[in-house]
Every structure is written in structure tokens, then in C-alpha cells.
Amino acid sequence: MLHIDELTFENEVLQSEKLVLVDFWAPWCGPCRMIGPILEEIAKEFNLKVVQVNTDENPNLATFYGIRSIPTLMLFKKGQRVDTVIGAVPKSILIHTINKYL
């Protein structure tokens, strides 16, 4: 899973030809750490890019995308945000959401 920041977000997410799942998280967030292994599995199982944005280190991105609670997972397709999942949800819910856009 790739860790990105404000400098690499446009290239890695907005200009990506692949579907991108962005995990807005922070290292002190228990639910964020809990969902991490699930995201690793999804990155291996699906034809999409999974990236993480540390909200503590990238507050401008968090503000721009209206992040109010973490983890917040956003799906981007061809540079456009197409879906958002808030919280440490079960893998089955993430899979259902991802499958809508593949």
C-alpha cells in the first residue's frame, strides 16, 4: 500500500487510470489500524490502487475533502470521487462498494 501526501496526490490519485481507494487515516487511530490489514488484502485481490493519506501530516487534503472522522475511505475513478465509506467497516461492505465501480 502506497503512502502519499499533498505533493503526490494528484499524480497517484487524480491522474490514475485505475480505480483508486484512498484511506484517510492517522497512526493514533485504533479503527484505522484495525482496517489496515483488510486494505492490504483488497489491494492484492482487486485491480485497483490502494493508497493512504496521513491526515495529521496532510491537513490541507483532509480539509479539502471534508474529512471529519477517520478512517474515511474514498474511491476515485478517472480523477473523480465516486464513493465514500466512513469508519472501520467489514471487508464485505468494502468489496460491495468497490465492485460497483470496477
Swiss-Prot record:
Role played: Participates in various redox reactions through the reversible oxidation of its active center dithiol to a disulfide and catalyzes dithiol-disulfide exchange reactions.
GO cellular component, one term: chloroplast
InterPro entries named among the record's database cross-references: Thioredoxin, Thioredoxin-like_sf, Thioredoxin_CS, Thioredoxin_domain
Active site: C29 (nucleophile), C32 (nucleophile)
Highest rank taxon of the organism: Eukaryota
First-listed, main subcellular location of the protein, grouped into a coarse class: plastid
UniProt keywords, alphabetically: Chloroplast, Disulfide bond, Electron transport, Plastid, Redox-active center, Transport
Domain (Thioredoxin) ranges: 2-102
Gene this chain is encoded by: trxA
GO-annotated molecular function: protein-disulfide reductase activity
Pfam family, one: Thioredoxin
Residue(s) at site: Contributes to redox potential value: G30, P31
Protein name listed in UniProt: Thioredoxin
Membership in a protein family: Belongs to the thioredoxin family.
Marked site (Deprotonates C-terminal active site Cys) residue numbers: D23
Location in or out of the cell: Plastid, Chloroplast
Signal peptide (UniProt feature, chain positions): none
PROSITE patterns reported in the protein's UniProt record: THIOREDOXIN_1, THIOREDOXIN_2
Paired cysteines (S-S): C29-C32
Keyword Zinc-finger set for record: no
